[in-house]
């Protein structure tokens, strides 16, 4: 009996382009999953003899002496498999990495997943409250932490009952390991072991690779369960199918934080899987980024809108050449067509620069432009293969016409199956037909059949590529029970023609309170990550505008904000519209 079968081999290192070609049609047919695995996944020892195993794949963009070939990575990952098991983590337990980007970060990801554990990356900007929430929602049992970030993790982990011996120091740059802690190198000292194997489709679909936090609109961040099936499907579509027409060897540079969904599995697994070199930046800085593109002759460039804005507005764009780039893409948030055109001027003639759209819940891109298709209209492209989509109106009724805006709902092999242990959110997000309701408003053009983002049903604020949920900020401000009676947070555009935003709080003081704007901002600064700061300011009101049912009328606040920005008004009495 024939069966469809799809494999995510988290170790991926051993698959040379030649061997990997057998996996490109991973939704093809086979008589037996076990035979399929045997065919495409030869033993690690056999693959280690392949000549392409010695090629350097991972490169430290800040220290050229640090590189990793497949052979080196293979050994490190097999050692980590043994180390994770020796450390006492059980199969299915979740481990977290708290670190800035590094070539060894991906090895830890691969080693942990290969050992049958589940990855979860935390934002290095987290404060203690955010770290504790992350630990609770992902059920992290084990940490690998860079020394500079240890204090927040120790306090958060201790308060959530994680013992000290489950925290390892990620001293990849020779940093000193604090007394009483073990270096992550301890995990490399227990020999080498092979990875966990999955030999049936249903287990593949229900076994997680990662638990990734995603901002919600009704509370704190939720945790999306990315499965092996999701990861394999995404790699097959993005790293192979969408680039099938590319005739050169891709060379990339990654400025993105490695906890982000855009790097899982695109940065952690796909480079070893394809064999294409990638340069990893520890932290983003504009000049080293541009210099790296020129020096390493980067061909495939992925950026986010704030980065595009920084590039086109900086004189550094004239100092460094981007002419090596042969295709570029922008994602995470919408990019206005004007900025897209300005960025294209910096590239060589004929180079494609397009946009994509996706979510944490879709393992990344859900729409894109397959190379060499071009666009200058601000579209986010076409749906990736094997994806079902529907549009619904505000009443949840299907929209069947082109050029009509509606909430886009998707299902397919890259869509995660659930939020981790959050039945309420699952019921609100997935319908009875299995469609994920994204909260994003799109339409499909009748002439070109291209998709366009026009609005967000969700009230997420996009700050430097990160998602900020207004309810999280509102909840933090309402902790000042003696000073704040009511609050609403919205996002203001950083520039008139930009989609980057700044959080602004509208605050109602309690009687007798004299809390100032600085005092309100301090409530956020002291407890939440820096990108969640109220850079859009604070406006004091007598009353927050609400509908008869109590819903905050954020549309009204945005209208006021538009007027205030023009008139430089800092206070306004709230009038509730009829």
From Swiss-Prot:
It comes from Alternaria alternata. It comes from the Eukaryota. Pathway: Mycotoxin biosynthesis. The keyword Membrane does not apply. Belongs to the ATP-dependent AMP-binding enzyme family. Gene clusters encoding host-selective toxins (HSTs) are localized on conditionally dispensable chromosomes (CDCs), also called supernumerary chromosomes, where they are present in multiple copies. The CDCs are not essential for saprophytic growth but controls host-selective pathogenicity. Although conventional disruption could not be accomplished due to the high number of the copies identified in the genome, the high sequence identity among these copies is likely an advantage for RNA silencing, because it allows knockdown of all copies of this gene simultaneously. This is Acyl-CoA synthetase ACTT5. It holds the Pfam family AMP-binding_C. Its EC number is 6.2.1.-. PANTHER family: ENZYME, PUTATIVE (AFU_ORTHOLOGUE AFUA_5G14270)-RELATED, LONG-CHAIN-FATTY-ACID--COA LIGASE. GO terms for biological process: secondary metabolic process. It is an enzyme of class 6 (ligase). Keywords: ATP-binding, Ligase, Nucleotide-binding, Virulence. Residues 472-551 are annotated as: AMP-binding.
